[in-house]
Amino acid sequence: MNRRQYLIALVIAAIFSACGTKANTQGRQESLDGKWEVKLSETEDNSSTENVKITLEFNLAEKRFGGEGICNTYGGDIETLNSSKGTIRLGDVISTLVACDNMAYENALFDRLPEVRRFQMKEGKCYLYGEDAETPLLILIRQ
């Protein structure tokens, strides 16, 4: 193979590689898998947690979820998930037992997670809803 053919092959490989990377990134953006920042909802006062990042991470391969609350780490099982229908059911939350300020916010998070039944991806956010709720229980922002 002469030098010109080698350079052309290299450029073509780079183009295909770049296209594949973009497709994987876009697919990940539409997936629950990965780490998110948690907000209770857009209508609720989140000011007590402005300086604290509460996270929720989904590991779809292991069917687990978990994260960092205000004071405690937590986790549980993903009992059911149907990404094409936008349905999900999370198991009971297991957490460490550290007490601190803003426990009401953290307890609200732990109470809502098992109520989640469906999700909707929209504009880089994931909205988690209860069975018949029109207002999201939780709003997740990709990290």
Placement of each model-derived feature along the sequence:
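Sec-dependent bacterial lipoprotein signal peptides
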Residues: M1-S17
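Lipid interaction determinants
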Residues: C19-Q143
